[in-house]
Structures are given as C-alpha cells and as structure tokens.
C-alpha cells in the first residue's frame, strides 16, 4: 500500500510493477469466455472484463513430439541469458535501438520446426503466419529463471507472437502501464458478464464496497495499472498474443511459476515495414527465404 509520502511512493507510480514483483495476479484469463475474471481472494472477486488478443491451443503437440524436440535442442549449446534463462536464437542479427539488422550468420529455422510450423496452419488465427525468427528459452527453478514484464519489439516483429510451452506448465502474467481505466462488469454464477444495470446477486455485490441500489450493480472503473492478468499455459500448449495482448499489455513470468524445467519456443513474423509493400520489403523477402529453408543452426 501507499506510504503517504507523495512523490516518492513507488506504489503510486508503478502499482502493476509492484504487483508483479510480489508475484500476485488479481485476475485470471478464461479461454472459454475470453474474459479476465477477478480472483477469488482478491478485491475483484465477482468482477470481469473482456481480455482480447489471447488464443490458446492445448496439447498442440504430442508427448513424443515434445520429447524429440527438446532432445534435438539439447544437442546444441544453450547460451546464458538474462534473469537465469538460457537461450538459442535462430534469426537475423538485430540492433533494436538503432533499428539496424543484417542476415549475418542466420541460416534459417531449425529442421525440427518445419512440422510445428505446418501444424500452425490448422489455426485460423495463424492464417498467413510466416515465422522469420525462432527463440528457444530454457527456464529452471535452480537458476531462479524468470522474465520481467516487457513488450516484444514492433519495428521488426509483426502482430502475432506465437509460443509453444514445453516440459512444464507455467503462468504468463500480463500487466499494463497505461493511464487508462478498465470497466469491470459483475459476473453471473455461470461466469458470464451481467448486462449493465441488471439485477444480480454475485460475489461482486459483496466485494464492491458499496450497496447496489435495489440490487442493480453498476459497472466499476479501475486503473489499468492496478490489474494483472494470469494466463495459464499448460504443458505442450500453444499461445498466440495479438492486438491488445501484444501492444497494450506487457507479458512476463514470475520465478514462482517456474516449478520444473520449462522450455519455450517463440516464433515471430515480420512487421508491415518488412512485408509486401513495406519500406524494407526486399530485405524481408530475403530473411523469410532463409528462415523457411529449415536448415538453421543457433546463431
């Protein structure tokens, strides 16, 4: 909470960062409804809001495929990365600050990704998705692996971020730094949003702090900074972030959500600037041709 020391209170400036550091998410994403629902023991129990831009496919690959993929990865070296992670990169050499890149030693995505990319075509949300870069990340509790809340670059990388979660479950924690507010609506017992102004008996009534007039519970506005949304990723699940989940909400993973070794395979597509009709269309074509040869080694 706030220390009352105005101008110096971190909580006033970075509530979403502090929530992240404490490892507590106060909403959980529901794939069946597309809603972020207030967690039972939070002040937001019984409230929810639409959380667009997350697409989840459970059991995207089989156990045998998972085992084979990780075995092939482990034949190559894992390079130390930040926050206790290790990585293998398959992509062009990029300086994001200076917005410069060169194909350099990029030899394409690895051969084992050909089948993964082919399977993606069955997902309507991945129509036309052409991965130009792959990053494998290795997390273990022994190294205290985590990843701070961040946005992926959008100068080079396009709208859809695609990740395959291997070896163990985890939780993607979504946080927002914007000055916006989020409109929460009370939920019915079935977990659906109640229409505005409807008669409702929900846990939201008990947690709103105000008596609803004659049982009518108005929507509730909360600062975006006070909201963090947990997106549960089962083992072997594929997750796609796009739209608001890509550009408005940062994603990160708490240390406490790495219980066993976890390997994440992230694929990225080109931005409009490097695609057909874009300023760097020719360079984009060259990179895609290399990527989709599927003959790559880690760079």
Where are the language model's segments positioned?
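Non-heme Fe(II) oxygenase metal-center motifs and adjacent flexible, charged/small-residue loops
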Residues: 1-299
